[in-house]
Amino acid sequence: MKLAFLIDPIAALDPTHDSTVALMEAAQLRGHEIWIGEISDLSVHVGEPLGLLRPLKIEPVQWLGDRWQVANPWFTAGEAKRRSLHDFAAVFMRKDPPVTTAYLYATYLLDLVDPKKTRVVNSPEGLRHANEKMYALQFQSVVPRTLVSSNKAEIRAFLDELRAAVLKPLGGKAGEGILFLDPGDRNFNSLVEISTQQGQLPVMVQQYLPEAKDGDKRIILVNGEPLGAVNRVPTGREFRGNMAVGGRVEAVPITDRDREICAAVAPRLRQDGLFFVGIDVIGGYLTEVNVTSPTGIREIDRLNGVSIGDQTIAALEALVNQG
């Protein structure tokens, strides 16, 4: 198959951590042809979706038991050519968040891809629908108590009821802007005013789960099925476990409760065309559903001796072959 990946600038990607690289590497190892571009390389000509794309060859990284071995250079990209997206069996939309105006417009261009000819992963409509904070609220049986509001008095009352909470910007990523709220914090008003832009933007306020100190579990789902998990544990004085803010990773099993959560969300994920997803679970509760560019493949592979990328591409092959 020919596969196109819409990514961030490839020279800025870390091949030992980036899940997009892991997916492209797995696809190449399975014999597929890889092409790359950025969302600014998309266009539509007389109704035909096009991309200014480059063929890519990757030198696979190797885990040596205590470190990654990476070739220098680890990739070779060929000459850019303007190609119809219908030349590809699938197009992976792997631009990292935040969801900007440019990102949103790219999904509109990808709407012009005929799903009978080419599968877009994840679905552009699904990407627009699934705000990574709000999407989880559809599944009330498995989420912690949550308020979404821009009203300071309402947030204050909810915090007083909970005694401790976590505030999350609705457009944040990788733990950015997440705050721990304590009823006794004299900075409460300022924190809420800054986060809501003086009451103009809603934020999510979620019950603080004490189990967060033991880790934030990332579970990778492919076509609704859980393939693997990694635990991200806060370090030092940081209460967030995100890898981007220094959280350490450790192996963790997928529990029966995790499978209950996955079973609750899977039908909606499939309905919305969300093929590759990372959900976050703390203390047996679903806290986020990550759909734009979920990470965690390299860490799960390294800790468990598996290849989530290979399993993902195999699942894609099965879908494409079904037609």
UniProtKB/Swiss-Prot annotation:
How would you classify this enzyme at the top EC level? ligase
A single GO cellular-component term from the record reads: cytoplasm
Stated family? Belongs to the prokaryotic GSH synthase family.
For this protein, what is any one GO molecular function term?
metal ion binding
Per the UniProt record, the source organism is: Synechococcus elongatus (strain ATCC 33912 / PCC 7942 / FACHB-805) (Anacystis nidulans R2)
| Record keyword Nucleotide-binding present | yes
Q: Name one Pfam family in it.
A: GSH-S_N
- Which keywords, in A-to-Z order, does the entry hold? ATP-binding, Glutathione biosynthesis, Ligase, Magnesium, Manganese, Metal-binding, Nucleotide-binding
**InterPro entries found in the cross-reference section:** ATP-grasp (IPR011761), ATP_grasp_subdomain_1 (IPR013815), Glut_synth_pro (IPR006284), GSHS_ATP-bd (IPR004218), GSHS_N (IPR004215), PreATP-grasp_dom_sf (IPR016185)
* Cofactor: how and how many bound: Binds 1 Mg(2+) or Mn(2+) ion per subunit.
Name the coenzymes or cofactors required. Answer: Mg(2+); Mn(2+)
Domain ATP-grasp residues, every copy? 133-317
Residues noted as binding ATP in the record, renumbered to the chain: 159-215
Pathway this chain belongs to: Sulfur metabolism; glutathione biosynthesis; glutathione from L-cysteine and L-glutamate: step 2/2
Q: Which gene encodes it?
A: gshB
Q: Mind telling me what this protein is named?
A: Glutathione synthetase
- Where along the chain is Mg(2+) bound? 288, 290
